[in-house]
Amino acid sequence: MLKLFSAFRKNKIWDFNGGIHPPEMKTQSNGTPLRQVPLAQRFVIPLKQHIGAEGELCVSVGDKVLRGQPLTRGRGKMLPVHAPTSGTVTAIAPHSTAHPSALAELSVIIDADGEDCWIPRDGWADYRTRSREELIERIHQFGVAGLGGAGFPTGVKLQGGGDKIETLIINAAECEPYITADDRLMQDCAAQVVEGIRILAHILQPREILIGIEDNKPQAISMLRAVLADSNDISLRVIPTKYPSGGAKQLTYILTGKQVPHGGRSSDIGVLMQNVGTAYAVKRAVIDGEPITERVVTLTGEAIARPGNVWARLGTPVRHLLNDAGFCPSADQMVIMGGPLMGFTLPWLDVPVVKITNCLLAPSANELGEPQEEQSCIRCSACADACPADLLPQQLYWFSKGQQHDKATTHNIADCIECGACAWVCPSNIPLVQYFRQEKAEIAAIRQEEKRAAEAKARFEARQARLEREKAARLERHKSAAVQPAAKDKDAIAAALARVKEKQAQATQPIVIKAGERPDNSAIIAAREARKAQARAKQAELQQTNDAATVADPRKTAVEAAIARAKARKLEQQQANAEPEEQVDPRKAAVEAAIARAKARKLEQQQSNAEPEEQVDPRKAAVEAAIARAKARKLEQQQANAEPEEQVDPRKAAVEAAIARAKARKLEQQQTNAEPEEQVDPRKAAVAAAIARAQAKKAAQQKVVNED
């Protein structure tokens, strides 16, 4: 009984709410085998054919490429694209792609050479000996993405599943009307599809593998059963035909009874789903060593003379495929990429086939019917009854139309699979899916802007924090630099502390004198002498500093000389105004005269050693010479008027006369060496010379008188 219940449970299927049963229209194209299409002359390969960022270009204009050669590098979620045939890269520029608004995206344009040469292919027939990481990396680098319509990178999806996948589901439902690409692929390539499923199972190691297929594909079901006859690891589940049973969440619930939570993924409940075409592409990438360069595309519609399924190279213009199938356009002809419910109308026919292109529908006017005018919503709730995601389409419609993004998000607009069932049953002909697509795009743009604002705020706060840290570090460095003395100050402080400690030690150490011995004061005397020597050295250093400052400043020297002359003049006046009874001592006068002469000589030397740029003024020199001669004359008069008993020493007089003559001669030389532009007056020089000769003659006469 338990075995019977287990078998019943194993084959049980569930049914989801909502859904519709539109005309299938599949017999137009599923009756003929897959066929090849002649190569186009030019291929346009968009760099972004998947969910995620585009890869990095690795070719340049003018490069020769082979079929399967990478055109971009894939890192992370960036999926590479490959050359669909051999030829020459003629341009790398924006081009319209498979998008409702025909947005231009960066594309590589290749002119085919007609040879269709492959790159060297290295297949892994022994893939079971390869590690999981190696297989995932090969699948990713060979450009395999979800071919069921989403275009999510397969390698990233397998990597994200990890070890938590318990059920691997292969989606073979293909529920949308007109599309028969997967049906025909399973009829013609069932063995290769099953081999690709086994590769996926080897990577994921799930507990069960389920193939879900609708009962409107009897030939494909027969082929799969024939291939799976001897295997028990893969279960084929035939489900009732109902749109949209091919949705990921809907098929997961049909086969397992598990519901994917709102905002979650199927991997959250241990389920991973892949499309039939993706499994076939995995087999070719791993075992055959062929990157994805082509896929099966359904060409159908009453405007096509030879409908069917073809192997279309990626990058082939849509116009080329339709012309090969006998396209007979009518007035206002419409071409839809995808199915009638989830597809979109192409703005023009030069867009290329990409990885997510599964159908090209060219309906006639009879198939489309008359266009219906959009009317107001009557709140009939037919859309809510048909919604397979258990949403409220009429409420989402009002929120989308009123730009109420928060309420639309609260009502789980992100869970809308855009199946078009609500628009199919709407009696008011409201294109609900278009409103929902626009609303989701606006919400995504708002979130992207909020993300950028948050990142900018984080960068600003990080910058402010960094500036505060740097400021605090600078203040700390300044504080530590102020607290710690310089190296010289440290040495001086250490020396002073050492001296203080030495003095304290000497003061505290008792002096012991033995009986009969004299105290030894040599240490004290030596210390005293050292202090005296230190004081003398310091005084000499200060004197040298003052002398250097005095010599360096000629103006200061001149001021000091003027002060000395004023002092001498004042002294002479005091001597002249002295009481007559107090006669001037000739010796004292001679000493003062000698001191005055020494001061004058010292000042002259300082002036001569001054900076060369400040030359001696000849007029000042002449004035000083005249003053010196006047002082000498005055001293001689004082000596002559001295007491007769105290006669002047003739030798001193001769010496003084010689000194006076030398000073006069020196002053004449200074005047001669003065600036050439300021010439000495010859009359003044003659007068000075005459005065000097008179002084010398007078001194000689005085000498003779004294001898007599």
From Swiss-Prot:
[4Fe-4S] cluster 2 binds at C387, C416, C419, C422. [4Fe-4S] cluster 1 binds at C377, C380, C383, C426. The keyword Transcription does not apply. Pfam families: Complex1_51K, Fer4_7, RnfC_N, SLBB. SUPFAM superfamilies: alpha-helical ferredoxin (SSF46548), Nqo1 FMN-binding domain-like (SSF142019). It is a peripheral membrane protein. It is found in: Cell inner membrane. NCBIfam families: PRK05035.1 (NF003454), rnfC (TIGR01945). HAMAP family: RsxC_RnfC. This is Ion-translocating oxidoreductase complex subunit C. It comes from Escherichia coli (strain 55989 / EAEC).
